[in-house]
Amino acid sequence: MNSLKKLLVGLEKRFKVSALVAPLLIMGEVLLEVLIPLIMARIIDVGISNHDVGYVVKYGLIMILAALASLGFGVFAGKYAAVASVGFARNIRHRLFNKIQDFSFGNVDKFSTSSLITRLTTDVTNTQNTFQMIIRMCIRSPFMFVSAIIMSFYINSKMALIFLAAIPLIAIPAAIIMKKAFPRFQEMMKNYDLLNGTVQENLIGIRAVKAFVREKDEIERFKIAANAVRTTQVKAEKLVILNMPIMQLVMYLSIIAILWFGGNFIIAGSMQVGELISFITYLTQILMSLMMISMIFVMLVISKASMNRIVEVLDEEVDIKSAEKSKAVSSVKDGSIK
């Protein structure tokens, strides 16, 4: 997060406003989404059970309006998040490019030209995508999670305990996976640098390659570099993909538990059918929020390496510094050089 704070320095006011407005709209969207299952439960338990058509129509219209309002909040939140993330990436590219212009040959050689190109392109794109996800999903998912938990306790506090049992079963494996995946993504980005360097060398020396008939050797060099990227990416992704099946397993087990206990509560008369249906909806919202949070962590793991690489360039001390108060020479009196 320290890297992200450094990258946010100098962000223009209009992009800061977009970055602040988007989360507010997302919170409005989530509140309406959480209220919809409760309205649906009232329609089933009161309107349909009592054959009250007027009640069903009234609350049905309220539910439709809530859904449309939630859609509107979501659309505008997406727009503002996109504007903020694109402006964020633009700011980083400008800062990187301006910094590189001051680099001496020693500074450039320290990073290599191919690495600087990767940092200006792939790393900035990864950081942009993560920033957009932070604005949207880092607000939406935790807020949805907390709101759905509160509503589930409001409906039936005993049934809500199932969620408290499911959360550690998802959180602990996700934390272990993320911790082990981060070094692998770092290695993958280094291999990207090598791949870009191989392509750059081939393009710069294309005349020499053709003159000395070295095409096959260059193709082999490219294959080795490309396979290194593929191998490290596969190693990292093999860990990350374990998240989804673990979460789905926990989600389905939770649904089974809710249906089992909920059915018994309905038979005992301590719970109504509409409440059980809304409870399942809240379960889906809670577990989907956890799944999205895990995806955010995956993106953070990938982009953390990218952000660190960008900050390395921005924090690099320039070997040769121009005089701060130097003035351009406008005239030379006698043409002599001293």
Predicted regions and their residues:
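Membrane-integrated ABC transporters
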Residues: 1-33, 40, 48-64, 77-81, ...
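An intracellular "coupling" helix at the cytosolic face of ABC transporter transmembrane type-1 domains
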Residues: 9, 13-16, 80, 102-106, ...
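Transmembrane helices of ABC transporter permease
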Residues: 14, 18-31, 42, 72, ...
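Hydrophobic alpha-helical transmembrane bundles that constitute the permease/transmembrane domains
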Residues: 23, 27-38, 64-75, 126-130, ...
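Helix-loop-helix
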Residues: 51-56, 151-165, 235-309, 313-314
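Cytoplasmic juxtamembrane "membrane-exit" helices immediately C-terminal to transmembrane segments
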Residues: 76-87, 91, 95, 153-154, ...
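Primarily ABC-family ATPase nucleotide-binding module
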Residues: 314-338
